[in-house]
Curated annotation (Swiss-Prot):
It comes from Diaporthe leptostromiformis (Lupinosis disease fungus). Its cofactor is Cu(2+). Cu cation B binds at residues 298, 324. It is found in: Membrane. InterPro entries: Di-copper_centre_dom_sf, Tyrosinase/Hemocyanin, Tyrosinase_Cu-bd. Residues 1-21 are annotated as: Disordered. The chain crosses the membrane at residues 61-81. The gene is phomQ2. Its EC number is 1.14.18.-. Pathway: Mycotoxin biosynthesis. It is an enzyme of class 1 (oxidoreductase). One of its GO terms (cellular component) is membrane. This is Tyrosinase-like protein phomQ2.
Amino acid sequence: MDNVGCEASSSRDPKGKKAVGFSPKLRVDKDCARWGNENVEEQTIGTQPTWRNHQHQTSRIRGFICATIIFVVCLGALSYIYRVDVSTTMLSTNQMNESHTAQCKNPPTRREWRGLTTGEKQEFTRSVNCLSRVPSKWGLNGTLYDDFSALHGGIGSWSHRSSSFLPWHRNALYVWEAALREHCGFNGQIPYWDWTMDWMNLANSSIWDSTEGFGGDGEVGGPITVGEGRCVVDGPFTDLRPIKYNHTYVQHCLSRGFRDNGTLGHMSGLPFRPEIIGEVRRKETFVDFEAAVEMHLHNAMHLAISGDFLALTAANDPIFYVHHAQMDHLWWQWQQENRERRLFEYNGKHMHNSTGHDASLDSMLVYGGFTEDIPVSEVMDTEKGKLCYRY
């Protein structure tokens, strides 16, 4: 599957490195500075395109990718700095490791958001807000919640458009859940949002409920904030004040801007209809499955929600975690359908700028000193080892 947008080329190759987040010196292609009107080739599954071939949307996609490449260049340098003293900055997951690594006999089940009780939903949102009051581990002028957004926007960006997209985010979710437990006393499991249940009317999903959900769209008629969005004014996260948007330090309200191309307040559910999900799950190889999940399902939702979700700092929005848990859920289901062959199937391009198909189970997932770097092999089976969960 062809990548859409600009590429960043490396002026030196990482010798012997297979690490997501390795930060070589970059040069940005001069064409990346242009926001052309060329049509993007449609990415299709089934009989209808997942994304509409529209010049306005093309411009937004290209602009989004160009801006984030500049952000990655800056964060690349920081990724080295963050590794200098990991003894004082590394986020601990020891509590979970001690309880789960030695034996994982009864892995708990991650449930769909609507399967949680009212009390469990409130406990989850309380813990998320709590994390936004814990001081930054990286010494940023923000909180631990902001650290996770910076982690994804910098180191995590190297996993996009590559085979490491699914395993890198799987472990990042685990680390985030561990932080909720350690710092905020969270005693549940990360839920997932099964958007296939809402495909006929995504904008009115119960996930956006102001009482038992994540709050809804940005304020109708309110001022534009970031990512063509507006401030979220209902729900449990109205007090969140992220400190960055992509490469820019700008404290702002949590912002969303539901849209279906030029139609505001609406979100197209076509990419998430059941027959599309069925086709994705029938992909025979890991490489094809990963590409379908990321380039279709993942990207389509980021564009539909917009606001904070339009940038690589999308983890500013708590919906990021239940969205990515759903993609992890789909991967888990795909693995279970043929455990003998798929449980440890991992190949393709390990990093988005890899020059060849270098991915292996020994390839490292790197987190820039935020938490321990681990080989891909440690996150392939969620029901054994340190992860210890199922869906």
